[in-house]
């Protein structure tokens, strides 16, 4: 079925606390992590909004693909909201248990998603952000991309599936990332398979334009 932009659906939908932007344009669902002041670190509300919207679009025949991105230009996602998780643990609450369980379920949903998922990994992609993108079908990095698992610096193991995807990287690079918490750029991400396409960040608006006019 062909769809010109003039006839394409453009639908904006409310998201929890506006921390997730939700939009459908030209049969493509766009999900934007919208906490730029916190480098788009994800909290439980955001995890639930992402999962709910992905589940809705999975059964919506008018949505043919999904794009994930972060707002602000500095980060796709800097990981989980560590402050809220730490405070929960210190106060004897179980937010941290609920968060990690549902975050893992969200990542698994993306790995098993029935429709193509494009992840725009512009800026920081750390910890939980790595978990979000590794299940995507197309993972795009830019000259601003920095990938890593910084949670190991506070004594935590590489989570969100890190023990799976890091162990499969060539040349022992995954072990190095998982032990040191170091960050890598676009070229290294492409080399080791953590990304499969690169473009200049200045071209991202052009990519949006092309998606809005894509015939499907």
Task: Give the location of each predicted region.
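Glycine- (often His-adjacent) and acidic-residue-rich active-site loop
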Residues: 70-105, 155
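Amphipathic alpha-helical blocks and their helix-capping loop/short-beta junctions
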Residues: 200-216
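Hydrophobic/aromatic residues within transmembrane alpha-helices
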Residues: 68, 81, 132-133, 188-189
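Conserved CoA-thioester-binding segment of acyl-CoA-metabolizing enzymes
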Residues: 1-69, 108
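Glycine-rich beta-to-alpha active-site loop
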Residues: 110-154, 181, 186
């Amino acid at each position: 079925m062909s769809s010109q932009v003039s006839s394409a659906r453009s639908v904006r939908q409310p998201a929890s606390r506006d921390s997730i932007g939700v939009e459908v344009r030209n049969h493509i669902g766009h999900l934007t992590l919208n906490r730029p002041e916190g480098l788009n670190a994800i909290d439980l509300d955001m995890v639930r909004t992402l999962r709910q919207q992905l589940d809705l679009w999975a059964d919506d025949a008018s949505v043919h693909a999904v794009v994930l991105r972060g707002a602000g230009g500095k980060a796709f996602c800097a990981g989980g909201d560590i402050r809220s998780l730490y405070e929960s643990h210190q106060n004897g609450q179980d937010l941290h248990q609920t968060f990690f369980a549902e975050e893992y379920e969200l990542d698994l949903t993306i790995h098993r998603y029935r429709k193509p998922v494009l992840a725009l990994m512009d800026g920081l992609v750390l910890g939980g952000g790595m978990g979000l993108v590794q299940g995507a079908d197309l993972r795009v990095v830019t000259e601003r991309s920095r990938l890593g698992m910084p949670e190991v610096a506070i004594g935590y193991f590489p989570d969100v599936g890190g023990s799976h995807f890091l162990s499969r990287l060539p040349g022992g690079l995954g072990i190095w990332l998982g032990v040191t918490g170091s960050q890598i750029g676009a070229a290294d991400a492409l080399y080791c398979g953590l990304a499969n396409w690169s473009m200049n960040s200045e071209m991202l608006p052009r990519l949006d334009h092309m998606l809005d006019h894509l015939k499907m």
